[in-house]
Amino acid sequence: MAASVSRAICVQKPGSKCTRDREATSFARRSVAAPRPPHAKAAGVIRSDSGAGRGQHCSPLRAVVDAAPIQTTKKRVFHFGKGKSEGNKTMKELLGGKGANLAEMASIGLSVPPGFTVSTEACQQYQDAGCALPAGLWAEIVDGLQWVEEYMGATLGDPQRPLLLSVRSGAAVSMPGMMDTVLNLGLNDEVAAGLAAKSGERFAYDSFRRFLDMFGNVVMDIPRSLFEEKLEHMKESKGLKNDTDLTASDLKELVGQYKEVYLSAKGEPFPSDPKKQLELAVLAVFNSWESPRAKKYRSINQITGLRGTAVNVQCMVFGNMGNTSGTGVLFTRNPNTGEKKLYGEFLVNAQGEDVVAGIRTPEDLDAMKNLMPQAYDELVENCNILESHYKEMQDIEFTVQENRLWMLQCRTGKRTGKSAVKIAVDMVNEGLVEPRSAIKMVEPGHLDQLLHPQFENPSAYKDQVIATGLPASPGAAVGQVVFTAEDAEAWHSQGKAAILVRAETSPEDVGGMHAAVGILTERGGMTSHAAVVARWWGKCCVSGCSGIRVNDAEKLVTIGSHVLREGEWLSLNGSTGEVILGKQPLSPPALSGDLGTFMAWVDDVRKLKVLANADTPDDALTARNNGAQGIGLCRTEHMFFASDERIKAVRQMIMAPTLELRQQALDRLLTYQRSDFEGIFRAMDGLPVTIRLLDHPSYEFLPEGNIEDIVSELCAETGANQEDALARIEKLSEVNPMLGFRGCRLGISYPELTEMQARAIFEAAIAMTNQGVQVFPEIMVPLVGTPQELGHQVTLIRQVAEKVFANVGKTIGYKVGTMIEIPRAALVADEIAEQAEFFSFGTNDLTQMTFGYSRDDVGKFIPVHLAQGILQHDPFEVLDQRGVGELVKFATERGRKARPNLKVGICGEHGGEPSSVAFFAKAGLDFVSCSPFRVPIARLAAAQVLV
């Protein structure tokens, strides 16, 4: 934050005519070309090893093209200074975000240190020219420099009237990984001596040694450690701890040592010509655009179509020129609470580095109010101007030099979820923005924070972090360690908070997962069973924590040097993946009345409906409370794991050697299923409920363990003999179960299974209708690949409906549709739509089958693919729009051609991921369905695509 406070500063001659209201004599480009810099005669190229460390695409830092300046028809250098600018906030594509905002602040009359921005188009021309400055550009840069010199009454390289500069990159989109800032450019021995005569030796030579460090590292790629070694050795030899304790004499000596480091590393002396320094810095910024880290950042974030980076050259101002100077950072509103009050820090007689290094503790802004009342009043006025102008909370950096305020930067301020919602609502109430604009001010991640518990003070536990895994499900959890699902349920029944620690979870663990306050797994990715189920329930989860070793037998987990046994306290941060020792204090979800107001605006705008994935009445109620417009996916197989009695009935059905015995088990399951459906219909009174028929492979209902234990348990539960049980297990075993005997294939082979589930749905719907509940059941057939498969199941379902309706003498409306999760189904969607009244894309399996990735095994290679830029996102987290997305669009278009009123949506994990939701909205889908806890996030994403 404060590191950049010192970036934009200027040294002015005491008593100079550089007053607040000073304006340039001319903003127009001069028709006479600026003189060529003296070093331009030095031919050719600076050695390519100057950029080797950053792996720059344009490795040589070339000298200025030795040619007469050529007039260009397109402007490439834009000036800015108080009251007048050649750019504005709308020119981010050309000036970069930083340059556009500097120009905007200057144009509305704020005191901005003057400077100029070299456009992104110039960077593009530089790249196109094979990393050589385009003809005429250097003359334009020198022209811009002369404008700044006239504005400030100071000259680059003049010891009597020294002008120092900062040089910074700035693309249209904020891009960490670009070139760092170069400060104090323009210093050499003569200028440092002149500066020392005016402002003191210590200040001058501290600035010089900082410049040598930054220029050497940032521009010439000399390892910073080489400079730091000299600094540390100097402090040790003097018995000092802090940089500020060094004397002027010490700093002078360091300057000499830093020059020796430069000479040794580059084989040539440090360039003393200030214009040569400026040239090399500009080239370094241009080259940084093609650095590996910048290209990787653009690839990962899908940033395309940009011309390059702009170069911002700005005069320096200093906050460390005595007790009438200082530096600070502030937010125009509290970024934690949203309160309309300035929130920030200020340091007297300091530069930003002092804050970053922790050398001094910053003071509240009230300190500035007391010490520099005139500058403070101007700062408050500027904050009000900027908020009204940008219509957003601003993050502002400023410096006061000898009682004069300089605005260094403004940008939209980062904030917490609670603050984001309050600021959006307050600004509408203040008449500053309209509701549609306010919707854009809150990020989906902000709502995620509001819907989960958080730690009171994350910085307080940093020394207690003992491992870090994947942040699989956000929020915070504090509980006592348990190692089995049964123990988690038992502890929960006793009113204890349990953290379930497993090597990995399975469907049989769902009871314990639901009972636990948090889940920690040794293995598994962001789409593992633990992660997916945790997100459905809004449970905090840290998965794939390779730094832990779980020992179920002894009920202990080893985390580094720590061994935790059952009952010991552990805390999890599901938003960061941190595993924290002990019992850390929690604060409840920060829900407020502002959130309801904000979400009402969201719902007024969006067209895409948002439903929820819910398997129990409690889930359904949570979904409804979070604004779900129905249930888009109710997984019937999850109901079977709800109790020992249910799982035994399922196993009896699986093991039954005859239809008669299988039907007996199904009759028991009918009672359970009917009761569950009644509860869900009741909770969703008046809203549609989509129930998916059994999808799990049969083997997932079998006990875990070695074959002898499985056989023994099955025999005890079902009455089968060991030989029959073993034969049945062998028959159920599959080489690739996720592509095997599951979904509609179960219902086709065992039609009585589909009949039981359909009967439970219709009987529950009739019972609830008789109680005055409005019921809209929709039955979804899973894993369909051909229209014949769907036709088989639809016929069975409609036959059951007719029988149930005839028995009770009453009918209800219902729909039968299918999941589109097999690529073939998407390709023949028109044929399938003849049988289906709705499509719901199961994007989890559709992604799995389209990529040929096993979801259970992607953790072995996806991280490598992401690290190498082969994939930009994990396709199980963020929809693959080019591949899977095209299948979604194709199937939707084909399906609606065959059935124009076809309802289409999705019910995979992507239904709660903001960029995926935006894609589905643009693709014309009718709904998305997601975890109950992500419903507000999907609602917001669906609205933001329209504003």
Curated annotation (Swiss-Prot):
KW Ribonucleoprotein (keyword) present: no
Co-factor(s): Mg(2+)
Temperature-activity note from the record: Loss of activity below 10 degrees Celsius.
Enzyme class: transferase
Location within or outside the cell: Plastid, Chloroplast; Cytoplasm
Region Disordered: start-end pairs: 21-54
Record annotation: effect of changing residue 527 to S/V: No effect on activity
Entry remark concerning the domains of this protein: The N-terminal domain contains the ATP/Pi binding site, the central domain the pyrophosphate/phosphate carrier histidine, and the C-terminal domain the pyruvate binding site.
Protein name: Pyruvate, phosphate dikinase 1, chloroplastic
Organism whose genome encodes this protein: Zea mays (Maize)
Organism placement in taxonomy: Eukaryota, Viridiplantae, Streptophyta, Embryophyta, Tracheophyta
Designated gene of the protein: PPDK1
